Design a protein with these regions (language model features):
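Ligand-site clamp/hinge motif
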Residues: 242, 248-294
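Gly/Pro-rich hinge or "lid" segments in bacterial periplasmic/extracellular proteins
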Residues: 73, 177, 185-257, 261
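Structural transition elements
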Residues: 346-392, 411-415
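Surface-exposed binding/hinge segments that line
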Residues: 120, 138-210
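Aromatic- and charge-enriched surface segment that lines or borders ligand/interaction sites
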Residues: 53, 87-140, 170, 321
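Long beta-strand-rich cores associated with HINT superfamily self-processing modules
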Residues: 535-563
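N-terminal lobe/hinge region of extracytoplasmic solute-binding protein
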Residues: 39-94, 229
Length: 563
């Protein structure tokens, strides 16, 4: 009875939204105009590219702005980087090992008719790199020459990004980093911004805040997306409490082959599923656990899209210096049991780099194989080995180590994972480890300061390349949350940075991951997970970027087959 009432209430909530919903996949009277309705998240937390962390926020910005390059799905279903705001790029290797990219812009315009200039990218990239903005995506630019000096001094002119003239942008990198065009130049966080527009909108927001009650949330320069000046294929036309409508940007300068109108719907996941089932939206993300389970039942070969992160236990090297203890902690983990807590798509981690990261035309994880013994059959033997390692380290009883603490961000399934880990460590090793849930901000503060012993964290990367999952762990790196130091690892990563794309580079990347996990046991990967979405069968052309956000600019009606 309670379930029926809840479903009825959800259905009623969905129907009350109907008055502000456009028709699903509606076409105009002439049949040529296409409106696509999409649900990919809750109400956006921000429309500022350097702060957008949610999939829905990033998806909207992906349609409002255009970067130097953009990703496109080709006829074979492969996602490749093509020209965006730049019409071409020249690459030159310098005598000192640095590499300079020279972009020539195509002469595109902002939505107010003003020309897109190289200086707009300089402003946006300097703003991203500036420690004062505290963007989590600043490391995207860590490969740009002068990045560390700019951040240390606060002088962003030291960042090697400059406008040679209004249509020519130059960027110098510290090494080859062949993923620069594919990953950095297509990222949401490196989208261009007009400094004069940001300044004007900030002043307007400040004026509003002066007369608003203190109890109200502060206005931001991006608070009203319909006031934004953007350079992508769409502009924000109408904002309501539950929808944002984008329409074609008349000044884009390229023909839009997809929808003339995109309507983004903001709702919780359950309501999103109802809207999709009732054909009130054409695309929905994410699919529920129940829906994914049903697909697996119907087709055992069905696979969720990989999420580019690995949940892992971080060991603070300044506190857990003994290799035997770290290795014992990792061996005592039943990864099958932990992965089951992550949901229907959870799988025991085989390494730090998750599935979905490319190695040429192959998958890096598949090519590298399992670096972690995660079989349930071998768990008893691993526990025996873990006990022996503790004894060899001089700890006959786990209690000899005293009481330890395991920190984690108190959200999602992290709490259940923490409790399970601490039970395993107590049962197998006799360790007294107390789990403590904190906010995500508190966790990051502890990790950066080194004031932790054990911590759980989703290890992700700002780019879809194996190097980006490994480069943070070099000695002295400000993002090295393990406080790990190994000169051999540093040397490998230095070689990788200067290597061109190819088998030699990939071999070094596999060696670096092996050194980090198998030889040093610097951290203990636990599990990876997946996600899934739906685009109604009447459509073709949309795709999910491996980094998470979606692209609907190429969606079109599936041709009708006449029999």
């Amino acid at each position: 009875m309670k379930l029926r009432k809840r479903l009825a209430a959800l259905a009623l909530a969905a129907l009350t939204l109907l008055t502000c919903l456009t028709g699903c996949g509606s076409a105009g009277d002439d049949g040529d105009r296409l409106s696509l309705s999409v649900r990919v998240g809750d109400k956006p937390a921000t429309y500022d590219p350097i702060y957008a962390e949610e999939i829905g926020d990033q998806t909207i910005l992906n349609h409002l702005y255009e970067n130097l390059m953009r990703l496109e799905k080709d006829e074979n279903g492969q996602i490749t980087a093509v020209s965006g705001a730049a019409k071409n790029v020249d690459v030159k290797e310098n005598a000192d090992g640095t590499v300079t990219y020279t972009f020539r812009l195509r002469g595109g315009k902002w939505s107010d008719g003003v020309e897109v200039k190289a200086g707009d990218f300089v402003y946006a990239w300097q703003r991203l790199a500036d420690p004062a903005t505290a963007s989590v995506y600043a490391p995207l630019l860590s490969i740009v020459s002068g990045y560390e000096q700019a951040r240390a001094s606060g002088d962003m002119s030291l960042l090697a990004v400059s406008a040679k003239n209004s249509s020519t942008l130059t960027v110098t990198l510290d090494g080859h980093y062949d993923w620069f065009l594919r990953e950095v130049c297509t990222s949401i966080a490196t989208m261009p911004l007009r400094q004069d527009v940001v300044k004007r909108l900030k002043e307007a927001a400040d004026a509003v805040n002066e007369v608003k009650p203190a109890s109200d949330s502060s206005a931001r320069w991006w608070s009203d997306p319909t006031m934004l000046v953007t350079n992508g294929p769409y502009t924000a036309e109408t904002l309501t409490g539950s929808t944002l409508t984008l329409t074609e940007n008349a000044n884009y300068g390229k023909k839009i082959t997809g929808p003339d109108e995109l309507v983004f719907h903001f709702s919780d996941e359950q309501t999103g599923q109802i809207l999709y089932a009732q054909e009130l939206v054409d695309a929905v993300w994410p699919l529920s656990e129940e829906e994914m389970a049903a697909r697996i039942t119907a087709d055992e070969t069905w696979q969720a899209d990989p999420v580019l992160e690995t949940y892992a236990v971080l060991f603070n090297w300044s506190r857990l210096e003994e290799d035997g203890i770290r290795r014992a902690l990792s061996l005592a983990i039943d990864r099958d049991a932990i992965a089951a807590l992550a949901g229907i798509t959870g799988k025991p981690a085989a390494g730090l780099v998750p599935p979905g990261v490319p190695e040429g035309e192959q998958d890096f994880r598949t090519s590298g194989g399992d670096l972690i013994d995660k079989t349930s059959e071998g768990y008893a033997d691993r526990c025996t080995q873990a006990v022996r390692l503790m004894q060899e380290a001089g700890y006959d009883r786990g209690s000899d180590l005293g009481t330890l603490e395991y920190l984690y961000a108190d959200e999602g399934t992290n709490g259940a994972v923490a409790e399970a880990l601490c039970r395993m460590w107590r049962s197998v090793l006799g360790l007294n480890i107390t789990p403590r849930g904190v906010t995500k901000a508190e966790l990051m503060t502890a990790l950066r300061s080194g004031s932790y012993t054990l911590a759980g964290m989703a290890v992700s990367a700002v780019c879809n390349d194996a190097e980006c999952f490994l480069m943070d762990w070099t000695s002295g790196n400000s993002d090295n949350l393990l406080h790990y130091e190994n000169s051999a690892f540093d040397t490998l990563m230095s070689i990788i940075a200067k290597a061109e794309e190819g088998s030699a580079r990939m071999g070094c990347l596999h060696d670096a991951e092996d050194l980090l996990l198998e030889i040093d046991c610097a951290l203990a990967p636990l599990y990876t997970a997946g996600t899934a979405w739906d685009l109604r069968e009447t459509y073709m052309g949309g795709f999910r970027d491996p980094r998470g956000w979606f692209d609907f600019r190429g969606v079109y009606l599936r041709p009708v087959t006449v029999q």
